[in-house]
Amino acid sequence: ITVDLEEYPVQEGSILLILPGQVHSIEQYLDYKMEYINIIFKLEMLLAKQTDICNSRYFTPLLDGTLRLTTHFTPGMPFYNEVAGCINAADEVCRTNPPAFQLVIKGQLFLLFSILISNCCETSASRKNQKSLEKMKRIIKYIETNYASKISIEEMADALDLSQSHFMKFFKNTMGTTF
């Protein structure tokens, strides 16, 4: 699995945290098969309607990318059991739907982010990686906006203010395939 241009080899029990705005993809390794579960929710559901300390100190920095969390958790890592416990508890509540289950889910998400922010913050990505990531986001946005038309290499290079050869080299080096 690749998140923000960094590859993470996964194994049974792996947990990957992908925040809003992070570019991510899944690629099969050789002929191995993998089963996975996505748990998707809007981080905004945890935001208070009015500005509070949780919004300003934790959630806003997560949303704008200035606070980065560990992406990949595997069994045996510090805090893996706590992270997995929150996810499993929320999953079990979704499965059984007891009265007021929404409150339990929200509580588990707050607990999860408390564990992550207290123990699993990372330093920012390198400047070079950040620039490549921003270029990739521009490419993806351009493709999303113009997906109904045929997009040429020349058009894509112009959109990024790059020469065609530089665009092709960048895309191949970053994505591992031609445009």
Report each predicted region and the residues it spans:
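A short beta-strand-loop-beta hairpin characteristic of the jelly-roll/cupin
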Residues: I1-Q11, E27
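All-alpha amphipathic helical-bundle segments outside canonical DNA-binding/catalytic cores
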Residues: M77-N81, C94-L111, N129-Q130
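Conserved metal-binding segment of the jelly-roll/cupin
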Residues: V10-H24
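Basic/polar phosphate-binding segments, predominantly the helix-turn-helix DNA-binding elements
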Residues: S114-E122, R138-F179
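A hydrophobic/aromatic-rich effector-binding and dimerization subdomain
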Residues: V23-E92
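Hydrophobic alpha-helical core bundles mediating ligand binding, dimerization, or RNAP-core interactions
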Residues: I40, I87-D91, I105, L109-I117, ...
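N-terminal positioning helix adjacent to the helix-turn-helix/winged-helix DNA-binding module
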Residues: F79-E82, K131-I139, M175
